Amino acid sequence: MKMWKKAASVMLASAMVFSLAACGSSGDSGKSGGSSDSDTFKIGGIGPTTGDAAIYGTAVKNGIQLAVDEINAAGGINGKQIEYKFEDDQADSEKSVNAYNTLKDWGMQALIGTTTSTPCTAVVEETHSDNMFQLTPSATAVDSIQYDNAFRMCFSDPNQGSASADYIAENKLATKVAIIYNSSDTYSSGIY
């Protein structure tokens, strides 16, 4: 059930991206790349499909593909069919930036990704420089959407930590709590 909810969330967010992109498709959507055939709209995705975090990237990749298939079957966006390409970044920042450049060279007009926080924080610098629309479905680090071209579908790390603390306090589950976290991990230190 949780996997279906996540896929549904990705599909809804993808539909939002496509709708927003269709509204602004007449302007320049990137300094280099961003142009495509007049009868298509190119959406890129980045996330890990191999490595330790592959379960997250694979779920995002498949969810986006479901949304693309559904939207294209319904006639596309204002008559434009969506072309979709997903790149594996193995949850690595350098590979994620390389994946972004590959998609930009392909002619990507909007990016869904990256899936994990550290690569997303690296890629958002590139999308900001290129004025490329970016939507991350799951990168929760505060810095992963620090510019006005980048958006997040989920809550941020500090929100998760605060919500957990509030829940514990409001439900009187504990009066003292010890926190053990990995200060070298973006997610752990973000929640703390």
Predicted regions, residues:
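Short, low-complexity disordered leader/linker segments with a strong preference
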Residues: M1-K42, A73
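Beta-alpha junction/loop-to-helix N-cap segments that form part of ligand/metal-binding clefts
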Residues: S29-K31, Y56-V60, A74-D143
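Extracytoplasmic "Venus flytrap"
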Residues: D37, G44-Q65, E87-S93, T115-T116, ...
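Envelope-exposed proteins and targeting segments
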Residues: D39-K42, K80, N149
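Flexible, small-residue-rich helix->loop connector segments that border functional cores
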Residues: Q65-I77, I168
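Acidic/polar active-site rim loop that often engages polyanionic ligands
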Residues: D143-N149
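An alpha-beta-alpha
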Residues: A150-Y192
